[in-house]
UniProtKB/Swiss-Prot annotation:
PANTHER family: AP2_ERF AND B3 DOMAIN-CONTAINING PROTEIN OS01G0141000 (PTHR31140:SF56), B3 DOMAIN-CONTAINING TRANSCRIPTION FACTOR ABI3 (PTHR31140). Disulfide bonds: none annotated. The keyword Transcription regulation applies. This is Putative AP2/ERF and B3 domain-containing protein Os01g0140700. Its main location: nucleus. It is found in: Nucleus. Residues 66-121, 178-287 bind DNA. The lineage of its organism: Eukaryota, Viridiplantae, Streptophyta, Embryophyta, Tracheophyta.
């Protein structure tokens, strides 16, 4: 919730100028990534300062939602939240009440079991045994993360195909597409991965026309399964300014969790037709081998100490 409140202030502050929709979209992405990278205490400080700057017109004038756990947002969207031991757990922001209510119901089933009070009375009964097993196989934090990233339905479907516990797509069922060694800018503060133009236009399922409204706007969202079976969602866009295809929103979190560094390789592939009924994209990381020579030298090095000083060390100048 704190991130959503902070985003409201960012929107209010940036909305006073006459910048173009493309600039606003890029700024919005950068703000989202900046908020996602903040520590909890830093984020709370931002929100408290933001609340003092909010104009009176941003106070909720819309009626509260008719659904449990759903709250209206000043930007016209709907938020979902659930309470766990008197602490609020934010489940994300959604385009309509029904989607937010669905997120609450999913969280309620995971947090409180089949006896949970949900927005749809038959929610627990309507949930398949496979979905309940899928929820039981994932921690509360994992389910909340899926809901916030809007990947729950995709991960559920993949989980149902493979069984309740998420299992990665096996090697034999992967069709390699292309690889890229990430650059310092790919894993830096720009929060984006530049996808090689030829590979993007050849392999990705939603090619963006360079002057289309989608490319000039927010692009499209693509889901990728990693080597652990986890689904990642990235925004895929075409930037006219640099004439490049990029993965933006969601990329910085991937970099942080995978510990990507310059020189590491990101490998893209696609599930084979024989694996499941629906093809999907996959992403993997290959870490560059570092310090191997130093390790060998250290292991082979003879240490002779005199009064605590290594007298057999390398004396080359």
């Amino acid at each position: 919730m704190e991130q959503e409140a902070a985003m409201v202030v960012f929107s209010c502050n940036s909305g006073s100028g006459g910048s173009s929709s493309t600039t606003d979209s890029k700024q919005e992405e950068e703000e989202e990534e900046e908020l996602a990278a903040m520590e909890e205490d830093e984020l709370i400080h931002v929100v408290q300062a933001a609340e003092l700057r909010l104009p009176s017109s941003t106070t909720a004038t819309r009626p509260s939602s008719r659904y449990k756990g759903v709250v209206p947002q000043p930007n016209g969207r709907w938020g979902a939240q659930i309470y766990e031991r008197h602490a609020r757990v934010w489940l994300g922001t959604f385009p309509d009440e029904e989607a937010a209510a669905r997120a609450y119901d999913v969280a309620a089933l995971r947090f409180r079991g089949r006896d949970a009070v949900t927005n749809r009375a038959p929610a627990a009964e309507g949930a398949s045994a496979g979905e309940l097993a899928f929820l039981a196989a994932h921690s509360k934090a994992e389910v909340v993360d899926m809901l916030r990233k809007h990947t729950y339905d995709d991960e559920l479907q993949q989980g149902l195909r493979r069984g309740s516990r998420a299992q990665p797509t096996p090697r034999w069922a992967r069709e390699p597409l292309f690889e890229k060694a990430v650059t310092p800018s790919d894993v830096g503060k720009l929060n984006r991965l530049v996808v090689p133009k030829q590979q993007a236009e050849r392999h990705f399922p939603f090619p963006l026309r360079r002057h289309s409204s989608d490319a000039a706007g927010k692009g499209v969202l693509l889901n990728f399964e990693d080597g652990d079976g986890k689904v990642w969602r990235f925004r895929y866009s075409y930037w006219n300014s640099s004439q490049s295809y990029v993965l933006t929103k969601g990329w910085s979190r991937f970099v942080r969790e995978k510990g990507l560094r310059p020189g590491d390789t990101v490998a893209f592939s696609r599930s084979a037709a024989a694996w499941g009924t629906e093809k999907h994209l996959l992403i993997d990381c290959k870490k560059m081998e570092r310090n191997n020579l130093a390790t060998v030298d250290d292991d082979a090095r003879v240490v002779v100490k005199l009064f605590g000083v290594d007298i057999a060390g390398d004396k080359t100048r």
